[in-house]
Amino acid sequence: MARIGDGGDLLKCSFCGKSQKQVKKLIAGPGVYICDECIDLCNEIIEEELADADDVKLDELPKPIEIREFLEGYVIGQDTAKRTLAVAVYNHYKRIQAGEKGRDSRHEPVELTKSNILMLGPTGCGKTYLAQTLAKMLNVPFAIADATALTEAGYVGEDVENILLKLIQAADYDVKRAETGIIYIDEVDKIARKSENPSITRDVSGEGVQQALLKILEGTQASVPPQGGRKHPHQEFIQIDTTNVLFIVAGAFAGLEKIIYERVGKRGLGFGAEVRSKAEIDTTDHFAEVMPEDLIKFGLIPEFIGRLPVVASVTNLDRESLVKILSEPKNALVKQYTRLFEMDGVELEFTDDALEAIADQAIHRGTGARGLRAIMEEVLLPVMYDIPSRDDVAKVVVTKETVQDNVLPTIVPRKPSRTERRDKSA
């Protein structure tokens, strides 16, 4: 295509009939011309049709029970967190739907505000995986950001707007679709300020980042550099409204349980008070009793906590839960490795005590569910190296001794076929 400038015969738009002098730009195709005004009109029509399609999707939003049931198929345990997330996500997208209808009818009686989510719990217990599975179910753009890489504007590091760029990229640069996506910010406990009292010196990677995140968490029209990095005065920006972006902010918050225990322990004073030992509190979900004052003591600023009204906590996974994670979900590790061995024509089997031994190792290492794959790789590496070059193996059996004592898995040889036996005897 060629742009038509001034000079020569007076050309007209093939759609609206305006001459090239009446419009800013006239673009030529094979025998036709279109002006910039008609292009803008076409874009508006397409955007309206896409918005209608999005409304249909919101009308079909699954109910909280359906969301929880979907999560059950992929994530073991963490029932309280699943319920909390299911309700929060359902209400969030219902709020978007109400906003769309209210904008069309101009008489929405109540303005519904956003409820972002704070997830607390040890590493390797499913926080990230829960958020990923939710986004997968809802078919919305999803981006993960690391809070430790962020710094306040003007300092070395990433600006908070780069988080929004990841979401836009996940939506294939469809800004309208990105505006209803989910952003998961991990390691948020690492941006806690260094002390409970405000510091005189700048805390550019702690309190400064919390301050910078406030606006996008609440909802604002943000300017995002299309290539990431720092903003430059002469570059064009992508404008994105974060009002309908759901933020799930998560962290391990190591040490927060001590703050909670100090506060909860004070209840056990005076006659008739319920006294609980530290061991009794530790066996329960201590994060379930978290209060805003605990998070402020930990180092989050009150304004930041106020923008995260929904709190979901995950608990440490015990041996039983880890064994279930290995074998029960739709994409369980045992099923994945069984499929890999099937592709080489070999059956793979884990004994029950082998799965328990793998779970025990993950608990011992303190890596939770995240460490299960590494242990499986260590256990299966010798046979995964050897078996593709062999044609005499029918089955591999992984036992408790294989996991605990580094003994090679039991290899069951394949019985030769009649043809092979006949050829051998000949």
From Swiss-Prot:
Keyword annotations from UniProtKB, A to Z: ATP-binding, Chaperone, Metal-binding, Nucleotide-binding, Zinc
Pfam families: AAA_2, ClpB_D2-small, zf-C4_ClpX
UniProt keyword annotation of Transmembrane helix present: no
Annotated GO CC locations: HslUV protease complex
Disulfide bond entries: none
Recorded GO MF terms: ATP binding; ATP hydrolysis activity; ATP-dependent protein folding chaperone; protein dimerization activity; unfolded protein binding; zinc ion binding
Binding-site positions, ATP: 122-129
Chain residues that bind Zn(2+): 13, 16, 35, 38
Residues of the ClpX-type ZB domain: 1-54
HAMAP family listed in its UniProt record: ClpX
PANTHER family associated with the record: ATP-DEPENDENT CLP PROTEASE ATP-BINDING SUBUNIT CLPX-LIKE, MITOCHONDRIAL, ATP-DEPENDENT CLP PROTEASE ATP-BINDING SUBUNIT CLPX-LIKE, MITOCHONDRIAL-RELATED
Subunit structure: Component of the ClpX-ClpP complex. Forms a hexameric ring that, in the presence of ATP, binds to fourteen ClpP subunits assembled into a disk-like structure with a central cavity, resembling the structure of eukaryotic proteasomes.
Role, per record: ATP-dependent specificity component of the Clp protease. It directs the protease to specific substrates. Can perform chaperone functions in the absence of ClpP.
Entry similarity comment: Belongs to the ClpX chaperone family.
Name by which UniProt lists this protein: ATP-dependent Clp protease ATP-binding subunit ClpX
Organism: Mycolicibacterium paratuberculosis (strain ATCC BAA-968 / K-10)
Gene: clpX
